[in-house]
Amino acid sequence: PRFRGTARLGAAVQLVMLRATGRHPDAFSGLPSVLLRYLTSALGMHATDIASVTSLYKDKDTRYEHQLWARERVGFAVVDDTTKPLLADALGELSASAVSVDDLIQQSEHWLFDRRLVLPGDRTLRDMARTAFAEQENAAIAAVRTCASPKQVQAALSHAFSKRSGPGGHTVLEWLRTPP
């Protein structure tokens, strides 16, 4: 076996979390205790054999080695200088149907997982999604300004922010944002 003792647990955690979520476990605040109990049992260990999963990774080289092994085992790659432009292009396309930055992030996570790319950190993905969403919004605003007169734009805005008749007293815009 490549890993011995408690190192097997670290490698197993990396493998299971990457395969299940597309992220390395250090991207999470913690591991579910049920998962940890299952893995220690499956490996013939006791949960008390380790103080914590973080104690396995006092040495960063060990964590890197486990992450690399898990990526190779499940066929995932990291987002790098080659794949980042592809992700940016995908975000541009996905932003046309996204209703918010959070929605775009969720769509991009699926896109990455489908292509077997490790999901980057939240900040990286959020910054890229925010940029793509803003570009889409700016294109939509430019299209409206090209096709509608200032008077028509003002009338549409007035209607969108007007109170809707009926219960709740919401604006038309709030009503439109409410899921069915």
Annotate each language-model stretch with its function.
Residues 1-180:
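Long amphipathic alpha-helical coiled-coil/heptad-repeat bundle
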